[in-house]
Amino acid sequence: LMPGEFLSIVGPSGCGKSTLLNLIAGLLTPEHGSITLGGRPVSSGSAAVGYMLQKDHLLEWRSIYKNILLGLEIRKELTPEKLAHAEALLQTYGLDRFRDARPSQLSGGMRQRAALIRTLVLEPELLLLDEPFSALDYQTRLNVSDDIGKILKSSGKPAILVTHDISEAISMADRV
């Protein structure tokens, strides 16, 4: 993938789309061959790969802001620069007014946007999206996928989306 390129992988349920992302993320080890990113082999917990799942996995007992900082806390990277970056992402993507809200107070689309910011704040080299809109109703899915597509394009990061929805893939990706 080139910088800023968006690739979609389309297929029916059970065909191995999520398994492929798990291999790319280093969560699974290939039986043969290897997977590299920037010439380096990927491994579990690699900071180079950001992974956005089907469910947002926001923790209800934490505010949106604290949820966004979770990965930085785990990595022990809560630097002033990273906190400023988190604040900028909240503002840029319209969640600054909801920084103190709990996840249950947000719509499904806003929750997905918070999950994406949580991924972007870690500044990965590659973004993986595993059917991140599948839990949303049709109209919300259209709006959120358009918003998130714009966010990803503006980030300049390459991204891989897996989906079973061909129209979603075509509307978001540079290549399918």
Predicted regions mapped to residue ranges:
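Catalytic Walker B motif of ABC-type/P-loop ATPase nucleotide-binding domains
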Residues: 127-130
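Conserved H-loop
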Residues: 156-162
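Conserved ABC ATPase "signature" region
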Residues: 69, 80-98, 149-150
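The feature captures the beta-strand-to-loop junction immediately N-terminal to the Walker
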Residues: 10-12
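Helix-to-loop junction immediately C-terminal to a conserved catalytic motif
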Residues: 25
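Conserved signature/switch motifs of ABC ATPase nucleotide-binding domains
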Residues: 101-104, 118, 122
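Short coil-to-helix segment of the ABC ATPase nucleotide-binding domain corresponding to the Q-loop/switch region
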Residues: 62-69
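Conserved ABC transporter NBD signature motif
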Residues: 33-45
